Design a protein with these regions (language model features):
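Surface-exposed, polar helix/loop patches in the mature regions of secreted/periplasmic/lumenal proteins
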Residues: 98-145
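Extreme N-terminal tail/first-helix region
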Residues: 23-43
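Gly/Pro-enriched, hydrophobic low-complexity segments
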Residues: 124-128, 134-208
Length: 208
């Protein structure tokens, strides 16, 4: 379960076989590069977002709510019966099983949460664009970790005119696919209790 849910974000390094080579970059035209720069600018201009989501995987369908407060914060709440809460705050990603009362921490840099919450989002450096597709009203960008392409890939799908992130697909090192679709996203929302919403303090350590 943990690997499937983390795959909704990315594949953490070390989950698959050691990579033998770097990711192979896509052959991009000047128009492609211009569109990628526009998408980077869109992501960097995002401040806050709240959305319902649907997740499809070999384990079935899950749903929940995602909250983004850039830079630095992301919260993913799964609806019952999935007893999971994930919060990314600056350098840590917290995975909390609300049923088992177990908490796991990972560096944000080892998850794709960094793609959404970094101060400066770039489709280069640690990640490589390995495929780029354009249709009249949408874009699909496939990314792999530059130094570890065998750990999997993520494909981000954007609607255009107006630009918005619509869904993503993650394929892990074993070829397992996880699809996440955003439903009725709202942008520029105000989180009045942001300090609590995006806290990565282990819930097990809170004294009631």
């Amino acid at each position: 379960m943990l690997s499937i849910l983390l795959a909704a974000l990315w594949v953490a390094p070390g989950n698959g076989p050691a990579a033998a080579a770097e990711a192979v970059p896509a052959d991009l035209s000047e128009a492609d590069r211009a569109d990628l720069a526009r998408i980077e600018a869109y992501l960097n201009d995002l401040t806050t977002m709240e959305s319902r989501f649907l997740q499809f995987s070999e384990e079935g369908v899950a749903e929940g709510r995602i909250m983004l407060d850039r830079p630095g914060h992301l919260r993913i709440e799964y609806a019952p019966p999935v007893p999971v809460l994930m919060i990314a705050s600056s350098r840590l990603l917290m995975y909390h099983d609300t049923q088992l009362k177990q908490t796991t921490f990972l560096p944000v840099s080892e998850t794709p949460a960094a793609l959404l919450i970094d101060d400066d989002i770039m489709f280069s450096g640690d990640v490589t664009v390995t495929a780029f597709e354009r249709t009249p009203k949408a874009f699909r960008i496939t990314l792999e970790q530059t130094d570890a392409p065998d750990t999997g890939s993520v494909t981000l799908m954007f609607e255009d005119a107006p630009m918005r992130l619509a869904k993503w697909r993650v394929i892990d090192a074993q070829g397992t696919a996880v699809d996440v679709s955003l439903l009725e996203p709202r942008f520029g929302v105000e989180f009045k209790n942001a300090g609590d919403l995006f806290s990565t303090i282990d819930p097990n350590s809170v004294i009631e």
